[in-house]
């Protein structure tokens, strides 16, 4: 999976969205000799937006930050204490709109060979955890329902349960997009 992403991401034409605001997230892939895992966070319950949601570390692009990689690495260091030098950037995934369509989010796939001790920023991050990629590849682990929100256009919302956490929404769409770029493809169509 890692080699296929390393080769494919820099060469492929990715979808770029123009929106009034931009954000970036780091999609950390842990490859430390054990099973491949994706690193995620659960946001604290008292945040003004996306409280309690499972998410990748990330945030808004700051003025003067013209590179989504810089934003994703900065946010990962701020939110979970992941030093940028521990991340090998594999490439950029397609941009995704937020539900309100006002923000374009650029996911940055990054490889972590040796996971350091992580320290969550407790004001934003309630928990840091990892999901084995092999589990994410199993179609029977995913559920979905029709998105009935405004502007959904028949889109489905996908859900993945893991150790009491629910991966869904934008984060689930990013995971499924990442998996679609691997030789095995996405477990959900």
What is the predicted function of each stretch?
Residues 1-56, 60-116, 125, 134, ...:
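N-terminal leader/linker segments that precede catalytic domains of diphosphate-processing enzymes
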Residues 101, 118-122, 140-142:
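A short secondary-structure junction signal
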Residues 128-129:
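Conserved cytochrome P450 K-helix/beta-meander segment immediately N-terminal to the heme-binding cysteine loop
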Residues 137-158:
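A short, charged helix-loop
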């Amino acid at each position: 999976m890692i080699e296929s992403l390393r080769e494919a991401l820099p060469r492929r034409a990715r979808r770029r969205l123009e929106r009034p605001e931009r954000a970036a997230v780091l999609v950390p892939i842990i490859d430390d000799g054990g099973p491949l895992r994706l690193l995620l966070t659960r946001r604290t319950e008292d945040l003004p937006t996306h409280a309690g949601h499972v998410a990748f570390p990330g945030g808004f692009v700051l003025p003067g930050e013209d590179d989504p990689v810089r934003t994703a690495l900065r946010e990962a260091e701020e939110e979970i204490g992941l030093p940028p030098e521990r991340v090998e950037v594999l490439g950029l995934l397609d941009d995704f709109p937020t539900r309100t369509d006002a923000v374009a989010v650029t996911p940055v796939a990054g490889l972590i060979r040796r996971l350091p001790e992580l320290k969550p920023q407790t004001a934003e991050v309630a928990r840091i955890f990892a999901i084995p990629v092999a589990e994410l590849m199993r179609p029977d682990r995913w559920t979905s329902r029709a998105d009935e929100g405004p502007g959904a256009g028949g889109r489905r919302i996908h859900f993945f349960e893991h150790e009491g956490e629910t991966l869904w929404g934008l984060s689930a769409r990013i995971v499924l997009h990442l998996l679609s770029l691997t030789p095995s493809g996405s477990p959900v169509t």
